[in-house]
């Protein structure tokens, strides 16, 4: 049986501006120390979308997260099952990387972390 922990949300409050990119992907534990790794499951690039309030930004992110997660759920599950069958433990990060441009600065961070473990069985 697979046990999934609660999602951990980490995000910064952005000033009013424009979201320029959006990316969703999981990372294997072995990929954490690498510059780039994992599988791109869902990504979309948006430009010139002005979001005047934090509430609208959060709503947009939540919508895209839900959409992309369900679109990629089967792939995520197959990857988890393959990994768990070998190691017994699987941890991965679904990183939603938001690049939010405001004047000359860019702010990028919004991360959801899942930990999946194979339930131990006594023999």
From Swiss-Prot:
<protein>
    <recommendedName>
        <fullName>Uncharacterized protein PM1123</fullName>
    </recommendedName>
</protein>
<dbReference type="GO" id="GO:0005886">
    <property type="term" value="C:plasma membrane"/>
</dbReference>
<keyword id="KW-1133">Transmembrane helix</keyword>
<feature type="transmembrane region" description="Helical">
    <location>
        <begin position="92"/>
        <end position="114"/>
    </location>
</feature>
<keyword id="KW-0472">Membrane</keyword>
<feature type="transmembrane region" description="Helical">
    <location>
        <begin position="55"/>
        <end position="77"/>
    </location>
</feature>
<keyword id="KW-0812">Transmembrane</keyword>
<keyword id="KW-1003">Cell membrane</keyword>
């Amino acid at each position: 049986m697979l046990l999934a922990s609660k999602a951990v949300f980490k995000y910064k409050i952005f000033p009013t501006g424009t979201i320029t990119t959006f990316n969703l992907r999981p990372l294997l534990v072995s990929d954490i120390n690498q510059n780039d790794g994992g599988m791109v499951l869902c990504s979309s690039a948006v430009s010139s979308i002005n979001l005047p309030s934090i509430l609208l930004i959060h709503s947009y992110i939540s919508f895209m997260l839900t959409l992309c997660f369900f679109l990629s759920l089967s792939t995520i599950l197959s990857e988890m099952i393959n990994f768990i069958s070998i190691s017994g433990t699987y941890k991965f990060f679904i990183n939603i990387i938001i690049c939010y441009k405001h004047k000359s600065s860019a702010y990028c961070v919004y991360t959801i972390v899942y930990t999946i473990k194979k339930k131990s069985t006594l023999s």
